[in-house]
From Swiss-Prot:
The lineage of its organism: Archaea, Methanobacteriati, Methanobacteriota, Methanomada group, Methanococci. This is Uncharacterized protein MJ0038. It comes from Methanocaldococcus jannaschii (strain ATCC 43067 / DSM 2661 / JAL-1 / JCM 10045 / NBRC 100440). It comes from the Archaea. Pfam families: DUF655.
Amino acid sequence: MVRGQYKKGNDERMRFPKKNKPQKFENYAWVLDYLPYGYPDKPDEPIVQGLGEYQFLLMEMIPKPNVDIELGERVYIGKGKRDKIDHVRRMIKYEQLTPTAKSELLYVVMEAVKIQEDRFVRFFNECPPITTRLHTLELLPEIKKKYMWKIIEEREAKKFESFKDFEERIGKNPVRIIAKRIEKELSDDKKDKYYLFVKWKKGIILNEDNMTFYLKE
């Protein structure tokens, strides 16, 4: 891509196909907070606040009796035998997270990103322009125009092979960049119309399968 090429034209409001893409089932979640006696203002059975590993769903889970739960722990919530989680009780919003869960969120997201390295390296290699004047990369923290063009030029010369390769060639920590974007998408309720990784909100969503955008209403 030549610098400035994707900016040609004056149509900033491209039309996105409307689509309600089925959500993928979460197999793993990460523990954000563990409340052995329920919420302080409403004592109840033990509650775990967690984050889905792939779709980054915020959820409330009920642990099995007499199990040890640690902050930042990865727990299985898929089909079949579960070691620590009895069931997922409900989905929750960012505002419903405890102060502890909010403080743990970025660090937990970073761990989830690290073990999905292939997914996010592919994102850096293939993410497209959104409109004639805006590229997906510009939505990432710390990137902006300067690093956007550096990433585009580097990936055209040779695809990124790993997080380490990206950091050595770009000079930025890719795990933190992705994690901060996910944290922003989770916390900015109705303030952000583009969602790259949090698929369950309404807005313009990136379909990572084919790297195109669709409108979810």
